[in-house]
């Protein structure tokens, strides 16, 4: 290891060596979630207070005990990614500055057919834990009704992840369709509590059943991943009978070490619960085509971009989240008469996928502000361009956009 005594989490005083020892202790569970899968390396080389960068390609000088798999991407590029198969591989990943593990939903032996369907229950601002749990229970029932078993874990942030082992018979498009059908059925059974709407400003104070984590090239923080929060929180597998009574903040490196030592991994049986997508794909046929864009949406501005049906204004585009929150505070200070009308869900701070790191977009939905009092779209308080110089012609407007990251997904 390099710099084993470097403090990674100042609040609990955890060093780089502490993180390696943690992953060695929970290796059985961590490898059950991430082992044998190509993974994106999310490297916090400047600490948890700085933005990480995402490295798809495995370092050339990787040790012999790190396998690799070459993935093909939508733009015609490819990347040889790391495949961890043992505890030594986990230690190597941490030594690179990775905190959480971000594997693809495929095995290295078959890169075209996922063996795991993933659902991220992502709460909008203003949603409490009990509502997230209510939606999780509905999702569990929908899965069971269609012959599948959902395995819950905390996301390590505010939400819940449901993992579903499936037969590797379907391609990414079919798996995503099955997940989308699950999300739509959850929304139908829990109206007002859950949303399958893709456009964030239309979800209100609901739990977004994020099916798009099943798109190709997406990854999700896997079980026992340490998340970049000050308390060293862990994405922790749960039994269904403890989902309602536990809270994400209870699960940190220290408490999960004790929990794992006492009871082992609640997901120990996940690989024995492999199911078929036939039921969810039949549900997709019954539900019919999903709504491609909200009613009234238009692309008639000549840009090819979707025009929201909501009265949105954009506040800023920034390189880091602290800069985004600072811009939001400045906008609120300049518009004090608007702030009392805003609900938590009206303030949209989105992490956006750049080429190798996240950038942030700040928008405000003025739907609850009286029309006469709505401010006009003005100049952005910050206008960071993550694509500048990376595409022919300069800015990213000519080269494509990365899209937003909901919950804990990584592109």
Regions found by a protein language model. Give the residues of each.
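C-terminal accessory nucleic-acid interaction domains of nucleic acid-metabolism proteins
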Residues: 1-14, 20, 28-31, 35-36, ...
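Charge-rich, low-complexity segments
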Residues: 1-90, 94, 299
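Short beta-strand
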Residues: 41-44, 150-156, 197-201
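Signature for HUH/AEP ssDNA processing cores
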Residues: 82-155, 166-174
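A short linear hydrophobic-aromatic micro-motif
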Residues: 147-153, 194, 343-348
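A short beta-strand motif that forms the metal-chelation/ATP-contact edge
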Residues: 161-167, 207-211, 358-364
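Acidic/polar low-complexity segments and flexible, solvent-exposed patches
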Residues: 297-411
């Amino acid at each position: 290891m390099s710099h084993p005594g470097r403090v990674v989490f100042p609040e609990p005083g955890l060093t780089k060596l502490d993180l390696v020892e943690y992953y060695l202790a929970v290796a059985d569970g961590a490898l059950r979630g991430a082992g044998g899968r190509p993974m994106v390396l999310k490297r916090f080389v400047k600490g948890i207070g700085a933005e990480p960068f995402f490295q798809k390609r495995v370092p050339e000088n990787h040790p012999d005990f790190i396998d690799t798999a070459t993935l093909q991407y939508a733009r015609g590029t490819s990347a040889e990614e790391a495949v961890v198969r043992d505890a030594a591989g986990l230690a190597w990943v941490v030594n690179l500055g990775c905190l959480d593990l971000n594997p693809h939903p495929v095995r290295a032996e078959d890169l075209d057919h996922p063996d795991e369907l993933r659902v991220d229950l992502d709460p909008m601002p203003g949603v409490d834990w009990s509502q997230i749990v209510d939606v999780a229970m509905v999702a569990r029932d929908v899965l069971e009704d269609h012959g599948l078993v959902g395995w819950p874990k905390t996301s390590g942030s505010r939400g819940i992840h449901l993992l579903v082992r499936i037969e590797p018979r379907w391609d990414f498009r079919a798996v995503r369709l099955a997940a989308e059908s699950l999300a739509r059925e959850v929304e139908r059974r829990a109206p007002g509590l859950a949303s399958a709407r893709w456009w964030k400003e239309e979800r209100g104070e609901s739990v977004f059943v994020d099916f798009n984590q099943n798109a190709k090239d997406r990854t999700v923080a896997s079980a026992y991943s340490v998340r970049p929060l000050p308390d060293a929180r862990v994405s922790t597998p749960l039994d269904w009978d403890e989902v309602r009574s536990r809270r994400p903040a209870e699960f940190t490196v220290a408490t999960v070490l004790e929990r794992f030592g006492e009871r082992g991994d609640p997901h120990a049986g996940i690989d024995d619960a492999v199911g078929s997508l036939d039921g969810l794909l039949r549900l997709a046929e019954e539900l019919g085509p999903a709504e491609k864009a909200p009613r009234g949406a238009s692309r008639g501005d000549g840009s090819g971009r979707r025009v929201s049906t909501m009265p949105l204004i954009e506040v800023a585009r920034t390189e880091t989240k602290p800069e985004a929150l600072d811009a939001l505070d400045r906008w609120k200070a300049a518009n004090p008469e608007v702030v009392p009308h805003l609900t938590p869900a009206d303030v949209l701070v989105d992490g956006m996928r750049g080429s190798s790191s996240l950038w942030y977009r700040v928008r405000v939905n003025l739907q609850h502000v009286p029309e006469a009092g709505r401010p006009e779209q003005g100049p952005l308080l910050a206008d960071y361009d993550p694509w500048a110089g990376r595409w022919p012609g300069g800015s990213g407007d000519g080269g494509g956009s990365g899209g937003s990251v909901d919950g804990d997904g990584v592109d």
